[in-house]
Amino acid sequence: MKYVFFVCSIFSVIVVFSICIFIFIYSLPIFKETGFLKFVFGMNWSPSSKHFGIFPMIVGSVYITILSTLLGGGFGFFTAVYISMFAPNKLKVILSQVIDLLAGIPSIVYGFFGMSVLVPFLKNISPNDIGEGVLASSIILAVMILPTITSITKYNLEAVYKYYYDGARALGNTHSQAVFGVIVKAAKSGIFSAIVLGMGRAIGETMAVMMVAGNAPFIPQDLFSYFRTMTINIALEMGYATGIHRSALIGTAFVLLLFILIINIILSLLKRNNLYFSFSFTSLFKKNKELKTDINNFSFKNYEMKMQTIKGDMLKYISIFATAVSTLFLVFIVVFILVRGLPHITLNLLFGKSNNSQMTLLPAIVSTSMMLFMSLIIAIPLGVFAAIYLTEYSKAKSKLIALIRIFTDSLSGIPSIVFGLFGMLVFANLLGIGRSILAGSLTLVLIILPSIIRQTEETLMSIPASLREGSLALGASKVRTIFQIVLPCGFSGIMTSVILSIGRIVGESAALIYTAGAVRYMPKGYLSSGSSFSVMMWMFSSEGLYINQTFATASILLIMIIVLNALLFFVNKKLKKDY
């Protein structure tokens, strides 16, 4: 069994290499014809004229990534500080649940909200009567990455050793001074990691931005300019592209992979540093060294100390304001979608026959269920077995284990649209499966596998070694110990990874359009094309005639996410074991 576990553990390495190799090979025709530098720095994208320059798309991607990270990162950081350091316990639980809920909302829902509410609002204040563009996309992306940044930052703040805080308070700091002067500084590596992860999601987002960007392949001139990102370029044109045009789109994905690689390298460098920076608490008072040593000079009558107190209080109130704005805005999105969508959920929409005259959700229900079953039945054993090898058979400081973990993290950072391209090239075309539910399911396996591995690995690592040693001392084999002691103890963590995977599958759209398909008809089997819930919602909104159905589908997606989060809360509260 050890070798089975090992093969499963290196699967992520094989997949990452395969994605890079296939994307590069299919990109070679455009690189040979135009040259890599001309392709990257070319200013004109006009497939009909055989001009393929993606620099405007690169600028657009970087532009909104920076803006959304500044906006979402700032609000996310201060929200995390308030929740972890200032909020009362009951409010902390509520806010944490709200943030976790909103982190699971599909991107297509955010995009539709932006198209329905944000774009009309910005159009009224725009100097050129345009609502779509850089500002709308940046706001939507900021809202999308805010829950991720908040959750990770909150975790890192709460992980700081308590004696750092106690030492700061003992030196005369207020609570606010201790938080912003000590705790935040000690956790800054983890905070930067959260922001970098947010950047990775922002630069790889497709569907939400496509609905509010305007999608013109030009360098944006101002906040209300139409623009196009690399991911949007792929999603818009891959459906009809052939020949060198198709190679140019795949080349765009290759350049996008290079950006993701750079972000992952930065993230790895941050993770190599110790989360907690060693520093002297007395450094907080280095400006006071010039003061007299008399104890009275450290009182709050001293002007400089008063300013430090005011600064700490100001940052505290900024945290309260950021939390209120973030939470209210995110809750408003959910309430708005539910209020507009729930009245339009009918039996005919759910279970009516979908044909040329009407579109219903029945094909999406069947297709999504089929993809859920197939992808989970493949990904769960792969992920759990990989985690078993990483925790039960790995050696301390093993370079191979470190390499596997790096590639697993890299796999989790690859944008959905790139997974979709890989699935189309390999599963649909190379293996001859075609656009089908099976091709979509296999693509989803690659998407959800990293989260299953890491969640299960973290759970298994938290199980005390004494339980394993006791089983082995009683004569049980290592494999029997794993299956009868370790895995049952880690059941809650495995269930958590499964629930999170279900949420990811239900909300996925970009990776499925060119693998599973985008059709309105009932699938006849796994080799038939089928549309997931999110893809069907995208089809509803694209038609322009099914606005009520789009709101209804968005409401159903939100209800699913709420139910999944409730299950997640139950699993963590009732099934998780404390050792």
Indicate residue ranges for each PLM-predicted region.
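Transmembrane-helix boundary motif in ABC transporter permease subunits
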Residues: 67-99, 263, 267-276, 375-408, ...
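Glycine/proline-centered hinge or cleavage motifs at structural transition points of membrane proteins
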Residues: 106, 171-172, 415, 474-475, ...
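C-terminal transmembrane helix and the adjacent membrane-cytosol boundary/short C-terminal tail
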Residues: 154-162, 169, 196, 236-296, ...
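Interhelical loop and adjacent transmembrane-helix boundary motif
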Residues: 124, 209-257, 357, 512-558
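Hydrophobic alpha-helical transmembrane segments of multipass integral membrane proteins
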Residues: 59, 63-71, 75, 79, ...
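Generic hydrophobic transmembrane alpha-helix motif, especially the helices
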Residues: 100-141, 409-444
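Transmembrane alpha-helices
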Residues: 152-153, 175-211, 455-456, 464, ...
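Periplasmic/extracellular loop-to-transmembrane helix junction in inner-membrane transport proteins
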Residues: 3, 25-68, 88, 236-246, ...
